[in-house]
Amino acid sequence: MAENQQAAGNENQNQPQFALQRIYVKDLSFESPNSPLVFQEQWKPQVNLDLNTSHNKISDNQYEVVLSLTVTAKVGEKVAYIVEIQQGGVFMISGIEGPQLGQMLGAYCPTILFPYAREAIDGIVNKGSFPALMLAPVNFDAIYAQALKRKQEEAAGEAKEEQTH
């Protein structure tokens, strides 16, 4: 009976495991360079969202994933505000390697972090006396797939160049 429990324990160690250990704001910045004059403008902002993800290995099964967002809102040619946030998370991932690990770190973890970053951005924008900013959901799986395809195309292009030289 103890042998069965030990065998079951060994099987569980080889099973893919994922756990969120911590979510935190790593960096947050808000600028409103044209306040208070921008409040007199008719509020029809052009909102631009730039995003980036990065990750690093902390220990054997621990990874830090950082989602960086920059939101720029302009009214006409005037910048109403700029918000920059780095939303971080520590994730325990084991039993997952190769392309699956890349997908977890490049798409799944940022998908978990995004609502926290969106909430922090909305809160700081509101404290700046601007209307609520509801950022639309982001399809990190599609972004990750596009980035992977672009890397593969670049690698294929470099391989072709090496063959022609």
UniProtKB/Swiss-Prot annotation:
GO terms for molecular function: unfolded protein binding. One of its GO terms (biological process) is protein folding. It comes from the Bacteria. Homotetramer, a dimer of dimers. One homotetramer interacts with 1 SecA dimer. It holds the Pfam family SecB. This is Protein-export protein SecB. The keyword Chaperone applies. GO terms for cellular component: cytoplasm. It is found in: Cytoplasm. Keywords: Chaperone, Cytoplasm, Protein transport, Translocation, Transport. It comes from Marinobacter nauticus (strain ATCC 700491 / DSM 11845 / VT8) (Marinobacter aquaeolei). The keyword Transport applies.
